[in-house]
Design a protein with these regions (language model features):
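Active-site-proximal specificity loops/subdomain of glycosyltransferases
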Residues: 40-88, 102-114
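Conserved catalytic core of nucleotide-sugar-dependent glycosyltransferases
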Residues: 58-63, 102-227
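N-proximal low-complexity "stem/linker" segments adjacent to membrane-targeting elements
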Residues: 1-31
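Active-site donor/metal-binding and catalytic loop motifs
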Residues: 218-229, 251-273
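Long, compositionally biased intrinsically disordered regions
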Residues: 271-331
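Short aromatic/hydrophobic "clamp" motif used to bind/position activated sugar donors
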Residues: 91
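Acidic metal-phosphate-binding loop of nucleotide-sugar-dependent transferases
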Residues: 97-100
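A short, conserved alpha-helix in the catalytic core of glycosyltransferases
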Residues: 207, 213, 230-251
């Protein structure tokens, strides 16, 4: 049996193999891992894809598995840890309805040497989508109070001299990641500009999701998805948390032109709207709490519990996550 690749694609799915998964399964040098949930078909199978069945997950030597609820998007946490267990050098995450373009693997190096577009003298929140199109559109999790503000100016800058981007967020064409308010009131398909990238310097925030996202090893600890919040919230909260801890290390997030297009699975938009309420009402408060936090990463869930962003369940789950990463030598 050939050795498992060191580059992983992590997905959780409750559907039979989709067009996106069949396409990803054909990529060379990448190991696709699908994390099953209670709703996943028991006969799920696809060549070149590792399906982590319920039984296999429960047999893993991971404390996180024992604490993690079923039927939640946070099931992806098991896939991240499985990748780390198997020596991951890169972790890419997506969903089963994001189909890669032929140019999908055109990622950026960790150290963005040379010129790159950087937000200059920007406000706290930057709508990255405005730098890839002229449409009235904003990413899921972007504060509604900031939607009508002008985008921050950008320049091609050589400073900061080093621009380190351990997390890189690709956009998605056709059905990009937007909130239910956008879909209910505008709902237009979008095609973003090509060959464009935007680095958000430390101190500048934009929500990023789990739908087309590359993580380098130094950011692996920040992959943790909370389970006590709705699935429409978990990756956005995770993204803001990750940005805060990257900023503390003088690092940032890179956004780049779409490497996938989305043929979106069915969603009840009214249900999405209800799930997203805290994104509409508490995002700025969350970032204020994060910016005021200066202790280590291991204590962040306790801090968020005090401000009622998560429940005790996530404090316990996060302790298990930190314990597992420590045992795996990834902390």
């Amino acid at each position: 049996m050939s050795a498992m690749p060191k580059k992983f694609i992590v997905i959780t799915s409750i559907n039979h193999p989709t067009k996106a998964l069949r396409t990803f399964s054909q990529l060379q040098d990448w190991q696709v891992v699908v994390v099953a949930d209670r709703k996943t078909p028991t006969d799920w199978e696809l060549a070149n894809v590792k399906i982590l069945t319920i039984e296999e997950q429960e047999a893993l030597p991971l404390q996180t598995v024992k604490c993690l609820r079923w039927n939640h998007y946070a099931r992806k946490n098991v896939g991240y840890l499985y990748a780390v267990m198997n020596g991951a050098e890169l972790i890419y995450e997506t969903d089963d309805d994001n189909i890669p373009y032929d140019s999908w693997e055109s990622f950026f190096p960790l150290d963005l040497d040379g010129d790159v577009k950087v937000c200059d003298d920007s406000p706290k929140f930057v709508n990255a989508y405005h730098h890839f199109c002229d449409a009235h559109i904003w990413p899921r999790g972007f504060p509604l109070t900031q939607v009508l503000n002008q985008p921050g100016s950008t320049q091609l800058l050589k400073r900061p001299a080093r621009k380190i981007a351990p997390v890189q967020q690709g956009l998605a064409d056709l059905e990009p990641d937007v909130d239910a308010i956008y879909r209910l009131t505008i709902g237009k398909p979008i095609t973003f500009s090509k060959n464009t990238s935007l680095y958000l310097a430390p101190g500048t925030y934009c929500p990023f999701n789990s739908q087309n996202t590359l993580w380098y090893p130094e950011a692996f600890p920040y992959l943790f998805l909370p389970a006590s919040v709705p699935s429409r919230v978990t990756d956005i909260w995770r993204g803001y948390i990750a940005q805060r801890f990257l900023h503390m290390q003088d690092k940032g997030v890179l956004f780049f032109s779409p490497s996938v297009y989305q043929e979106r699975n069915y969603h009840n938009l009214h249900h999405d709207f209800i799930q997203e309420i805290e994104l509409y009402t508490r995002t700025e408060e969350l970032v204020s709490v994060l910016d005021a936090y200066h202790a280590d990463y291991a204590g962040i869930m306790e801090q968020l519990l005090q401000h009622q962003f998560v429940q005790q369940e996530d404090v316990d789950l996060f302790k298990a996550w930190i314990s597992d990463l420590t045992q795996l030598g990834a902390m």
